[in-house]
UniProtKB/Swiss-Prot annotation:
Belongs to the papillomaviridae L1 protein family. The gene is L1. Keywords: Capsid protein, Disulfide bond, Host nucleus, Host-virus interaction, Late protein, T=7 icosahedral capsid protein, Viral attachment to host cell, Viral penetration into host cytoplasm, Virion, Virus endocytosis by host, Virus entry into host cell. SUPFAM superfamilies: Group I dsDNA viruses (SSF88648). InterPro entries: Capsid_L1_Papillomavir, Capsid_L1_sf_Papillomavir, dsDNA_vir_gr_I_capsid. This is Major capsid protein L1. Residues 512-521 have a biased composition (Low complexity). Its main location: virion. Forms an icosahedral capsid with a T=7 symmetry and a 50 nm diameter. The capsid is composed of 72 pentamers linked to each other by disulfide bonds and associated with L2 proteins. Binds to heparan sulfate proteoglycans on cell surface of basal layer keratinocytes to provide initial virion attachment. This binding mediates a conformational change in the virus capsid that facilitates efficient infection. The virion enters the host cell via endocytosis. During virus trafficking, L1 protein dissociates from the viral DNA and the genomic DNA is released to the host nucleus. GO terms for biological process: endocytosis involved in viral entry into host cell; virion attachment to host cell. It is found in: Virion; Host nucleus. HAMAP family: PPV_L1.
Length: 529
């Protein structure tokens, strides 16, 4: 074969030579194979796909109403008051309109529910779950603006309308100042507690300066939002206890607290969408006054940013400016509460399924944050004296939660059970699915006299109860296990749901049959006619 190709090439060159063609040049221009320089992208490694709950959850036409009682909270708006004899015991809790209210609503197990007709599902191959399809958060008490402040606030001078250059700050220039906070209305619904974010004190590298007076490094931290945590009031979401050592830069209610802001980005990107079915949010704020801080400035203003002054402007004032926030007017026209909301499609993969028979409702409402002033007389005299009266502050809150739940069923196929086990193995454990241990081949010991002191104790240890994974967090527990009702038309939210869904309530009363006297009189009239 090789000899044949050589002969062909020889005769080709001879022909080109006779024809007067440069055959060597044509030979060099022949196509030659070269490796491709283009980058080849291989497909990614296949991973398990997260699907919506609608893929494996079948909804029924059975709906239930559940509602809480009137929920009330009373306390001091700025701080909790401990017992003088026992500081670990709180006499008056801290209840502020600038706090999160996180309700952990407990639902009954539908698999242990007494249904009039159980033919709609097979308990051997299916399990029942609740789906939240409607909610209404009721808020009592009048609209009002709550005031917060500090009797020793680090406020040096007014930087908005100052007509002369201020003098240098003295040893202590703190003043008594109050203000209102940013206006916030918020509602978060999910079957897991919401996640918050705040800026805390980070860990500096070994080579960085971390001596006394150095600026601490910042780190964005994510934590669970608990009941009673403070919201962002207009001074940022941060750990004020760790990042403000003077305890005078912000009002009393947050100077030693952590202000958290919901991590909407993190909860929206959650794989299974359990923390955030949907949320309602309304925020507004404007700046009322402009001040600056007293104290030694840790970072000087660069000299290339200004020309040096003379006389009273030779020494620069502090450039640590700060505003006082204000939420402006509150109005009933911009309320998010006291109205129903229907969940048709959640923003995540969990379309309202209440895993673990629980649902979390997180509420913030600063439009009802009035702080009431109470006064008691300590000494009675004919003339008015300040020392004869004691002043107290209290804040009250009133809530009412109503739900519409839809009964759903899940077919326990191998793929579905594997998927649920990957998502949350506690769900299968609550459904009493588990691995059965193989029979033991060891010989067991059995004593005759089990109460004898001559042998080891034969008392079996009681089974340990399942530990609550959220027991270290603080929530407002709401038990609705005995407050479900199928008579939707007997409750306000139930009637709204029937109207919204186009259902009609079944009549409960039957028409009474005509009496014998009326029938006989009708017959007599017919005969006369």
């Amino acid at each position: 074969m090789y000899l044949f190709m050589v002969v062909i090439l020889f005769y080709t060159l001879v022909i080109f030579y006779v024809a007067g063609v440069n055959g060597f040049h044509i030979f060099l221009q022949m196509s030659v194979w070269r490796p491709s320089e283009a980058t080849v992208y291989l497909p990614p490694v296949p991973v398990s796909k997260v699907v919506s709950t609608d893929e494996y959850v079948s909804r029924t036409s059975i709906y239930y109403y559940a509602g809480s009682s009137r929920l009330l909270a009373v306390g001091h708006p700025y701080f909790s008051i401990p017992n003088p004899s026992n500081t670990k015991k709180v006499l008056v809790p801290k209840v502020s309109g600038l706090q999160y209210r996180v309700f952990r609503v407990r639902l009954p197990d539908p698999n242990k529910f007494g249904f009039p007709d159980t033919s709609f599902y097979n308990p051997d191959t299916q399990r029942l779950v609740w789906a939240c399809v409607g909610i209404e958060i009721g808020r009592g008490q009048p609209l009002g603006v709550g005031i917060s402040g500090h009797p020793l606030l680090n406020k040096f001078d007014d930087t908005e309308t100052n007509n002369k250059y201020p003098s240098q700050p003295g040893t202590d220039n703190r003043e008594c100042l109050s203000m209102d906070a940013k206006q916030t209305q918020l509602c978060i619904i999910g079957c897991k507690p919401p996640t918050g974010e705040h800026w805390g004190k980070g860990t500096p590298c070994s080579g960085n300066s971390n001596g006394p007076g150095a600026c601490p490094p910042l780190e964005l931290m994510n934590t669970v939002i608990e009941d009673g945590d403070m919201i962002d009031t207009g001074f940022g979401c941060m750990d004020f206890k760790s990042l403000q050592a003077n305890k005078s830069d912000v009002p009393l209610d947050i100077c030693t607290s952590i202000c958290k802001y919901p991590d909407y980005l993190g909860m929206a990107s959650e794989a299974y969408g359990d923390s955030l079915f949907f949320f309602l949010r309304r925020e507004q704020m404007f700046v009322r006054h402009l001040f600056n801080r007293a104290g030694k400035l840790g970072e000087d203003v660069p000299t290339d940013l200004y020309f040096k002054g003379s006389a009273n402007t030779s020494a620069l004032q502090t450039s640590a400016f700060f505003p006082t926030p204000s939420g402006s007017m509150v109005s009933s026209e911009s309320q998010l509460f006291n109205k129903p909301y229907w969940l048709q499609r959640a923003q995540g993969h969990n379309n309202g399924i209440c895993w673990g028979n629980q649902i979390f409702v997180t509420v913030v409402d600063t439009t009802r944050s009035t702080n009431m002033t109470l006064c008691s007389e300590e000494k009675s005299e004919a003339t008015y004296k300040n020392e004869n009266f004691k002043e107290y502050l209290r804040h009250v809150e009133e809530y009412d939660l109503q739900f519409i739940f839809q009964l759903c069923k899940i077919s326990l196929t191998a793929n579905v059970m594997q998927y649920i086990h990957t998502m949350n193995p506690d769900i299968l454990e609550d459904w009493q699915f588990g691995l059965t241990p193989p029979p033991s081949g060891n010989l067991q010991d059995t004593y005759r006299f089990v109460t004898s002191q001559a042998i080891t104790c034969q008392k079996t240890s009681p089974p340990t109860a399942k530990e609550d994974p959220l027991k270290k967090y603080s929530f407002w527990e709401i038990n609705l296990k005995e407050k479900f009702s199928a008579d939707l038309d007997q409750f306000p939210l139930g009637r709204k749901f029937l109207l919204q869904a186009g259902f009609t309530a079944k009549p409960k009363l039957k028409r009474s049959s005509p009496s014998s006297s009326s029938s006989s009189s009708a017959k007599r009239k017919k005969v006369k006619r």
